[in-house]
Every structure is written in C-alpha cells, then in structure tokens.
Amino acid sequence: MAIEPASLDAPFAALAAFDWGGDAKTLAPIDAAVVAAHGDASLTAEVEKRLAAVLGSPAPRAAKQYACRKLSLIGTAASVPALAALLADKDLSHMARFALERYAAPEATTVLRTALGSVEGDLKIGMLSSLAAKRDTASVPAIAALVTGDSAVAVAAAEALGLIAGPEAAAALAAAQTGGAAAEAVVDARLACAEALVKAGRKADARSIYEALSKAVGDAPTTHRGRAVRMACQRGLFATMEG
C-alpha cells in the first residue's frame, strides 16, 4: 500500500515534540515510511525533506538524533546541508557524522572535510574518524598537517591516515614529526598502510615501509613494543615475498 504524504503529518508533528521517555510508537509510521522509501524516489524525497526540517527546528535533541538515524538510511545530497549545520554542535555532531558517513553523495564527504578545518578538540577527532571511515584520500593533506607534536588530535590523525592507507597516506606518515603516543600511533598507522599496500599489490612500496620501521627499532629491541614492531615487520616482509 502506497504511503500518502498527508498520512505523515501527525507522526512528524509528534516527532517535533519527541523527547527521551516519549512514546516511540507515535513514530512507527515514520519508521515504516523510511523502509517503504527504498526504491521509491518520490517518497524518499518527501520523508527526507521532513526529516531535514526537524534538524533545523527547535525540536528536542532526542528528535534530532532520531532524524539523523533515519537520514543515515535514506539520505541524499538534498539533506547534506541540514546535517552539515550540526557538525559544530557538541551535542549533535556525532549523530550528524553517523549519518554523513553512510551517504554515497560526494557532498557528504566535502562537508566533513570542511568541518575538519573549523572545529577543535573532540569534534575535530570525530571528523578525522568519519573521514577515515569514508577512506577519503582527498583529505590526506589536511589530515597529515595535524600529525604533529603529541596530542590526542595528532594520534587520531595518524590513525585516520592508517585507515585511509594508500601511497599518499604512507608518505605523509613517513614525514610526520611526532612524539609520545602520537609517535607510536604513526608507527601503527605505517604498519597498517604497509599491509594495505601488500593487499593492493604494491609490495615494493610496502617493503620499503617494513624495512624502515625494522631499521628504526634495531636488530634487538629491548622493549616489548619494539619487539612487537620488529615481529610485525618480519611478517610483513615475508608477505612481500609471497606470490
């Protein structure tokens, strides 16, 4: 049975006032509409428009989080601006990112890149996580610039480059100037890049990373971590010789 737009008026009115502890059954018609929207462009556009409107309204945080979750399932480029407006909101940024990570529209990745340069602290770390989840190679230069010193952001940036992997990320990590936990994160990320390069058939590139890291820890490392890195390099070097 087709869902008529007018039948969504009451459920969306309930959503506009929905808060923690509210009756979730009143939102069931929206849940059903989201499911029915798959394969139905007209219904998708209608539901998406209404969900995006909730994000720009004075609705409670619970209602906006619900809207973000539903947009993560059916959202298109049309609702990217509404989600982008929440990326600097300390209470809703994580839910906006949750949705945008799942968008196929390139506009979603673009707004995450833009937000990376405008937010700080935990919100910046969140953007790094989302860009890594999307394996966004275009963000490598901006992320690489954050891999400096010894801070939580530097650690997160190194981890993001390790997840994005590829030769550009590997080169950025090799040039990183860090210390403490960030330096350890860089080593781990370089190992992740090398593993990804092996899987991509770029064994010579991977081998150069393993050799550099192995040389850095020496033939007889005295710490548990140093020994673990050397062992990982030895396994990696063996993998570059297979096939």
Predicted regions mapped to residue ranges:
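Short, small-residue-enriched loops and turns at beta-alpha junctions
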Residues: 180
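General marker for long, soluble alpha-helical cores
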Residues: 46-47
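Short N-terminal segments immediately surrounding and downstream of signal-peptide cleavage
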Residues: 4-17
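Structural detector for internal amphipathic alpha-helices that build alpha-solenoid repeat scaffolds
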Residues: 2-3, 20-42, 53-56, 62-76, ...
